[in-house]
Structure formats: C-alpha cells, structure tokens
Amino acid sequence: MAMETGLIFHPYMRPGRSARQTFDWGIKSAVQADSVGIDSMMISEHASQIWENIPNPELLIAAAALQTKNIKFAPMAHLLPHQHPAKLATMIGWLSQILEGRYFLGIGAGAYPQASYMHGIRNAGQSNTATGGEETKNLNDMVRESLFIMEKIWKREPFFHEGKYWDAGYPEELEGEEGDEQHKLADFSPWGGKAPEIAVTGFSYNSPSMRLAGERNFKPVSIFSGLDALKRHWEVYSEAAIEAGHTPDRSRHAVSHTVFCADTDKEAKRLVMEGPIGYCFERYLIPIWRRFGMMDGYAKDAGIDPVDADLEFLVDNVFLVGSPDTVTEKINALFEATGGWGTLQVEAHDYYDDPAPWFQSLELISKEVAPKILLPKR
C-alpha cells in the first residue's frame, strides 16, 4: 500500500482577509483536494492568531462535507480546555453522524497562551514547546478530564461527574408507555455508536501529546520539527502504546510538512519563495519559530546556527519542494532517516487570489508522488 495524503488548514490567511474569504478558500481547498484524491483534511481551531483565524472548524467541516464525496475531515484540533466537554461531545457526535463515516476527531490543549487567557487560563506557556509551568500542566490535565466526560456521554449511560474543572452528566431515560416517544433522549453518540478515531498533534521533542496518543491508542500527528524530534515522537508514542497493551502501527502516523510541487525544481522554488508560502514564512512563521526555539531542530539537521536559518535555507533543506521526482526523493530520504509514516499532511496556504499553482501542486502530490511512496513496516 502507498502513503496517504492530507491537508492541514490552519489556514495561514494573510491579515486583511475577511472571514468570508477564509471560509470560501477552505471550501474551495476541500473540493479540490477531494477531486484529486487527497484522503483527509484537518482544520485548525484558533481564537487569537490573526494568521490562524478559524475559531469554529466544525462550521467549515459541515459546509465542505456537502460539496465533497470521499475526503475525511477532522478538527485539528478542538482545544478541550476551552470548551465544556458536554457541549463538545454533543456537537462532535452529531457532526460525525452528518458525515456518515468521513469524520475523525483531533484534540489538543491549546498552543497559544493568548487563546488560553481568553478562556480564563492565565500564565499558560506554549503547550507544544518546552515553555510553561503549572498552568501548562493543568491544560494537559484538563484534556484528560474532558476526554473522560465526553467518552462517558457517548456511551449514553446515566452518570454525574463532579470534577476538578467541570461538572457534567447524562440523565437516565424515563420509561414511558409503549409507543410513547416523548420521554426518549436524542442520540448524539458518534457515527457507528462508538467514539470516533481520535488524533493528537505533537511538536516538541518530548511531546506529552505523543505519550497520550500512545497510552490511549490515538492517531499520532507530528508537526515536522527536525529529524531528531520526528524520531523521538515515534519512540515516545511506541513506548507508551506498548506499555498500555497496544500495537504501534506506523501507517497510522501522520506527519505535517510544507510541501509544494511544480513541473520543475526551479519553478517550484520560485513559486514558494515569491508566493504565499514565502510571504507567510517571512512575515509570520519564521519570527514565531525563532521566538519559541522551534527553528533549532532544522538548524541542527543541517549543522548551522539557528539564526542563519532563513527562508531560502528552509526551502532548500527542510521543505519538500520541487518536481514530483524530487519531492519523492526527499520523502524517501526522510523515510530512510526516520522510519517513515502513513500520511503526509500538507500544510495549506493562502492561494485565494491565484489558486492554480496550489491546486496543481496538490494534484501532483496526490497522483505522482504519494503512489510511489510505500508504507513502512510496523
């Protein structure tokens, strides 16, 4: 079997885009991805960042589902500390029923302190980096309690939970006369009657999210941050999975990366350097990565000082940019160095004004790159 492909839509829209433009670009991206055989689309949830400005991914998922046939969708991720688990469990269950098997669930603790602050959580560090203290630990505790409540609600069995962070329950269904349906409770359990597949993202070297994924047999999604971190993610995930009695399977591992294909290497590099991807990295991602030490892994792989890691360095040495043959070679080299993965999750960017280069890239990745990448052994 060959590697699967997916999109991850943060959405990295440049400041000044309207909410309607962002929404429309998400729908167009989903339709194009579905038409060229992309397997999945993850849509981020953020409440504070101007470049990552989708607070309700479920709205985009519901709208895109009506215009697509095969592609699966996931919020990536619902930030569990920011929402009441009973409300979230009900919404997730209903949306998964609407999508009839094309839904999986991404969960997270929240990457940005500003968003946590908006939800009443002060002094939280970057949950996907090494910063943060007790409040960051509390975010991870909140994730676990929220999951406990949601899974209880999906079972539709009576309970009441008085927790550290939330109180929630599920009422007992009242008995009525035969044929009397006025006392029955609506069924908002997920499609198929059991919890949906759950995925979590990890970035930092010793990612607590990867440990949680292994413990709970969730799908691990690594944000590529260098060879050492990617290898460590699989080690942490595998160790936790085996300790919990699960069998780790690399085909379930997804890796999120910056990928762009064109007919030639020269054209691909030019389109990235001069286009929306380059603009986003120069204005937003490179400054953030430097601020939080997230450039260190890339620099270490190349043996340079992180301060010397600029856009051209990333395009030439980190991103998967080039012709289909070149991108295939780069992925195979990463497989050789890290052990491989099952899904390449392509980072989406703001090609709203001129979609053609991006749509061509997605088609080349799906049809000319992915089929040549064989799934790794477990």
From Swiss-Prot:
Catalytic activity, as annotated: (1S,4S)-bornane-2,5-dione + FMNH2 + O2 = (1S,4S)-5-oxo-1,2-campholide + FMN + H2O + H(+)
Induction details: By (-)-camphor and, to a lesser extent, by (+)-camphor.
Keyword flag Flavoprotein: yes
Record-listed E.C. numbers: 1.14.14.155
Annotated Pfam families: Bac_luciferase
GO molecular function: monooxygenase activity; oxidoreductase activity, acting on paired donors, with incorporation or reduction of molecular oxygen
Superkingdom assignment: Bacteria
pH dependence: Optimum pH is 7.0.
InterPro entries registered for this protein in UniProt: Bact_Lucif_Oxidored, Luciferase-like_dom, Luciferase-like_sf
Disulfide bonds: none
SUPFAM superfamilies: Bacterial luciferase-like (SSF51679)
The entry's keywords: Flavoprotein, FMN, Monooxygenase, Oxidoreductase, Plasmid
GO cellular component, one term: cytosol
Binding site for FMN: 10, 44, 76, 201-209
The protein's assembly and partners: Homodimer. Likely forms a loose transient complex with a P.putida flavin reductase that provides the required FMNH(2) to the enzyme.
Record family assignment: Belongs to the bacterial luciferase oxidoreductase family.
Stated role: Involved in the degradation and assimilation of (-)-camphor, which allows P.putida strain NCIMB 10007 to grow on this enantiomer of camphor as the sole carbon source. Catalyzes the FMNH(2)-dependent lactonization of 3,6-diketocamphane via a Baeyer-Villiger oxidation to produce the unstable lactone 5-oxo-1,2-campholide with (S,S) configuration, that presumably undergoes spontaneous hydrolysis to form 2-oxo-Delta(3)-4,5,5-trimethylcyclopentenylacetate. Is also able to convert (-)-camphor to the corresponding lactone in vitro.
Record protein name field: 3,6-diketocamphane 1,6-monooxygenase
Gene this protein is translated from: camE36
